[in-house]
């Protein structure tokens, strides 16, 4: 299965000045990714009655490289076969050309190098790179919408300029090997909602966001939501757990 996103840079020990350069390049890459995703998302809405795409579709069918039918999951960022899902963390793969935004988003989406700075504390999910961007699951019908689930319409939003569609994203994992309760690890993640702590405030303690009106900005963390399981990793939420602020 093709991987559109190239592998991230190898993890090496670098001087503080070079880590700063990594941070700057991460900011530029996140900005470019969110800008392109936002533009592609706007085109998708215009051609689909202004209704948002699903976060995921279970039991989605596809054709593999050999022309054989396969079953898997179509996430907002690409398609993963059931065979890939059973390959184990860090060995999974997905095909971005079969995601709902394929054809709307240019192929210049790049992996975010900031994950490499966390060295042994980072656990990759896929072998084909680290997008580092999450989609608003509230817009996309929930984490696992059914075939008849309706996603939100753009016209349902009370103030599109204050509704986040995309943001820098990651989570702390302590339940999938090699992570554990005694060794929590940072991993790439792909969605935000009203309950989970999955916003990654990696741009100088703020998160980069793309709003529903097409604008982009930065938002700070609500400190009451900070995930303290990994020192120096800024994971949390924009608003208290249970709040739909910035979500609809």
Predicted region positions:
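Short, well-structured segments within or immediately adjacent to enzyme catalytic domains
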Residues: 30-248
């Amino acid at each position: 299965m093709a991987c559109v996103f190239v592998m991230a840079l190898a993890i090496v020990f670098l001087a503080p000045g070079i880590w700063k350069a990594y941070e700057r390049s991460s900011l530029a890459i996140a900005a470019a990714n969110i800008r392109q995703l936002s533009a592609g998302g706007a085109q998708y809405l215009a051609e689909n009655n202004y209704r948002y795409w699903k976060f995921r579709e279970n039991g989605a069918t596809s054709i593999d490289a050999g022309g054989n039918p396969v079953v898997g999951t179509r996430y907002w960022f690409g398609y993963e076969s059931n065979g890939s899902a059973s390959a184990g963390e860090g060995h999974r793969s997905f095909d971005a050309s079969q995601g709902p935004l394929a054809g709307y988003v240019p192929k210049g989406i790049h992996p975010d190098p900031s994950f490499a700075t966390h060295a042994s504390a980072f656990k990759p999910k896929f072998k084909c790179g680290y997008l580092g961007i999450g989609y608003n699951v509230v817009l996309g019908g929930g984490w696992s919408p059914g075939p008849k689930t309706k996603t939100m319409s753009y016209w349902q939003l009370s103030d599109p300029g204050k509704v986040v569609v995309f943001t820098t994203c990651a989570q702390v994992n302590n339940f999938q090997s090699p992570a554990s309760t005694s060794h929590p690890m940072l991993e790439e993640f792909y969605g935000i909602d009203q309950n989970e702590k999955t916003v990654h405030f990696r741009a100088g303690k703020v998160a980069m966001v793309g709003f529903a009106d097409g604008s982009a900005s930065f938002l700070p963390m609500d400190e009451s939501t900070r995930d303290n399981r990994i020192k120096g990793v800024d994971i949390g939420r924009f608003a208290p757990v249970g709040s739909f602020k910035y979500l609809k």
